């Protein structure tokens, strides 16, 4: 089912983000801590409306936020990604952008970036998944 707004998706139980996990919220985008982070600081940038122009705004917000974290030295690098569709691993069927902080040594071989995700952290539904400390 397609939801037109974040509020509509939340009311239907299709948007699992909670007020307690909110990092930022404005007219266009809400930012939440990921419930199943692949790295400490993993955030979701969620457009308030399911419209391409607003989804693009969420993507811009994520890039700007990640860039600022690198400039201030809080992060060394970052990945930005969107899972579009079930075959791509999307489990929450409302658009959202992942911003994943990266640090030297967080995986054995970072070559390829998002092509390899982060070993052992991709499938948070498997037995034994542990959130990064």
Residue ranges and their predicted role:
Residues 1-133:
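HIT superfamily nucleotide-processing domains
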């Amino acid at each position: 089912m397609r939801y037109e707004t974040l509020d509509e998706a939340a009311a239907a139980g299709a948007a699992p983000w909670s007020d307690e996990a909110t990092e930022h919220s404005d007219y266009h985008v809400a930012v939440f801590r990921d419930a199943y982070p692949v790295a400490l600081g993993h955030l979701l940038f969620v457009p308030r409306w399911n419209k391409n122009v607003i989804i693009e705004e969420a993507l811009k917000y994520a890039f700007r936020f990640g860039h600022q974290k690198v400039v201030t030295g809080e992060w060394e690098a970052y990945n930005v990604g969107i899972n579009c569709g079930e075959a791509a691993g999307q489990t929450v069927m409302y658009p959202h952008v992942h911003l994943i902080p990266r640090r030297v040594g967080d995986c054995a071989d970072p070559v390829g970036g998002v092509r390899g995700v982060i070993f052992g952290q991709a499938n948070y539904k498997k037995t034994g998944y542990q959130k990064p400390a």
